[in-house]
Amino acid sequence: LDMGHMVNAIGQIDEFVNLGANSIETDVSFDSSANPEYTYHGIPCDCGRNCKKWENFNDFLKGLRSATTPGNSKYKEKLVLVVFDLKTGSLYDNQANDAGKKLAKNLLQHYWNNGNNGGRAYIVLSIPDLNHYPLIKGFTDTLKQEGHPELLDKLGYDFSGNDAIGDVAKAYKKAGVSGHVWQSDGITNCLLRGLTRVKEAVANRDSGNGYINKVYYWTVDKRATTRDALDAGVDGIMTNYPDVITDVLNEAAYKSKFRVATYEDNPWETFKK
């Protein structure tokens, strides 16, 4: 996946997909009652980016639905997966379940159109704090209660805090999750981070008995770092410049080993070499 980073305004969906992104990441902020409120990052954010673009969450969902519904005039066939970077740091731990419920209701109504020809993209819920694992159950229970368990097929999970791999595995156990796991690793583009933990995550993915299905690395804006990440065997790279990732994927060394994922690829299935 060529993952466009910090896509928080509806107009940016087109912008990033046109540069080659087949996936986007969107920030979700919550109000004090655990309602998803805005698609907003705020200051500080990545170097060289405007941190302040935003929409009301439900408006963004409607724009995203248009971009991922075949037949819609705004439809972008290439856009297959969306990561919601859930900014739950503003919430108390005991609000995590509620946040999941409210998030699910919003997506069900405004993105999935209550199961009636809604958006088709796969959705990854990315949670920054292992203690907020009840958000997952809040979300999945709500989809079941509302009569749409089939949408769980479209749903994946990520803990984005760069925690020890063993601790992340425990959090998933508590959450009752087995499968559909993307493991992120990374840091803002203003700083450097090695690939030690990425390689650990890739090893877990390829071990046959690990919890990880896919690994992505963020935020990569340079060709050299892109090559290093691909050499380490990642499944996705999050970037402010999707065209940089596209360029590297077109280099002779990578063209034969990697291709950009399409909707027909299963994002929950570990790729066997």
UniProtKB/Swiss-Prot annotation:
Keywords noted in UniProt: Cytolysis, Dermonecrotic toxin, Disulfide bond, Hemolysis, Lipid degradation, Lipid metabolism, Lyase, Magnesium, Metal-binding, Secreted, Toxin
Disulfide cross-links: C45-C51, C47-C190
Which BP terms in the Gene Ontology apply to this protein?
killing of cells of another organism; lipid catabolic process
Gene3D superfamilies associated with the record: Phosphatidylinositol (PI) phosphodiesterase
Q: Which InterPro entries match?
A: PLC-like_Pdiesterase_TIM-brl (IPR017946)
Catalytic center residues: H5, H41 (nucleophile)
Any note on cofactor binding?
A: Binds 1 Mg(2+) ion per subunit.
How would you summarize where this protein is expressed among tissues?
Expressed by the venom gland.
> Cellular component per GO?
extracellular region
Q: Quote the CDD domains the UniProt record gives.
A: GDPD_like_SMaseD_PLD
> Where in or outside the cell?
Secreted
Annotated residues that bind Mg(2+) are located at E25, D27, D85
Which Gene Ontology MF annotations are present? lyase activity; metal ion binding; phosphoric diester hydrolase activity; toxin activity
Summary of the function given for this chain in its UniProt record:
Dermonecrotic toxins cleave the phosphodiester linkage between the phosphate and headgroup of certain phospholipids (sphingolipid and lysolipid substrates), forming an alcohol (often choline) and a cyclic phosphate. This toxin acts on sphingomyelin (SM). It may also act on ceramide phosphoethanolamine (CPE), lysophosphatidylcholine (LPC) and lysophosphatidylethanolamine (LPE), but not on lysophosphatidylserine (LPS), and lysophosphatidylglycerol (LPG). It acts by transphosphatidylation, releasing exclusively cyclic phosphate products as second products.
What is the similarity comment for this entry? Belongs to the arthropod phospholipase D family. Class II subfamily.
Q: Kindly provide the name given to this protein in its UniProt entry.
A: Dermonecrotic toxin LhSicTox-alphaIA1i
Q: What is the species listed in this Swiss-Prot or TrEMBL entry?
A: Loxosceles hirsuta (Recluse spider)
Record lineage: Eukaryota, Metazoa, Ecdysozoa, Arthropoda, Chelicerata
